[in-house]
Regions:
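Alpha-helical transmembrane segments of integral membrane proteins, especially early/N-terminal helices
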Residues: 3-25, 52-59
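Non-transmembrane, membrane-proximal soluble domains of secreted or membrane proteins
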Residues: 19-45, 57-60, 65-219
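Alpha-helical transmembrane segments and their helix-start/interface "positive-inside/aromatic belt" motifs
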Residues: 1-12, 43-47, 88-93
């Protein structure tokens, strides 16, 4: 029991240090949309759970290696352990429960990012090798810059004129493939910008030799 308590305390310490370290690293870019807030909350929870699981595995492994290693001159056989039914059930059910919880939370997060607001600005987003085009049917305007109002939801209708592209603005967090094939393959995403700034639309699907240059300004 003494070793279990010590290892448990070490797990908590390592978990705390990992979480604090991850918060300082700032793995994610600026949060610039309502949808980003929802997604970042899920990311934050996932990072905390991953930090705990990492600490749980590494601490027990290293503690066993250094504390229970064979002593010099000890030639006796180690205790033979064939199995532990309770432990096997626990390490099967715990990951299963974790996956199910994150599946539910992920579904809720997805539903929140797709929640429709009245009078959303409609924008047709067309990808082609290797550029983006943005059409505003309500105003009969076409632009190579994505103009979006602050604190107003926009619904983006994504399509492609040639191969599969993927619309991604890291600061908005949302990402969705733009597919060729006509209206039946149009995909929709909703974005509500919250911070005034200059961002970049990036293609997140390998689409040809100039894929890396497929950028468009967002204002």
């Amino acid at each position: 029991m003494k070793h279990l308590v010590i290892a448990g305390i070490l797990v908590l310490i390592v978990t705390t240090l990992l979480i604090l370290g991850l918060e300082q690293v700032r793995l994610l870019p600026a949060q610039a949309s309502v949808q980003a807030q929802t997604i970042d909350q899920l990311f934050s929870l996932e990072f905390k759970v991953i930090a705990f699981l990492f600490a749980l595995i590494v601490v027990f492994m290293l503690y066993s290696i250094f504390v229970f290693r064979r002593k010099p001159g000890d030639t006796t056989d180690a205790a033979h352990i064939e199995g532990n039914t309770k432990l096997e059930i626990a390490w099967t059910l715990a990951p299963l429960a974790t996956v199910m919880v994150f599946a539910v939370l992920g579904g809720q997060s997805l539903a929140e990012t797709m929640r429709a607001e009245p009078r959303a600005l409609e924008i047709n987003v067309i990808g082609q090798q290797w550029a983006w085009r943005f059409e505003y049917p309500q105003y009969e305007v076409t632009s190579d810059t994505l103009w979006m109002p602050i604190d107003k939801q926009a619904i983006l209708h994504l399509s492609s004129e040639d191969v599969i592209h993927s619309f991604w603005v890291p600061e908005f967090r949302v990402k969705q493939d733009a597919l060729p094939g006509g209206e039946e393959f149009v995909r929709n995403i909703r974005v509500t910008p919250t911070i005034l700034g200059d961002y970049k639309v990036r293609c997140a699907e390998l689409c040809g030799t100039q894929h890396a240059t497929m950028l468009a300004p967002v204002k």
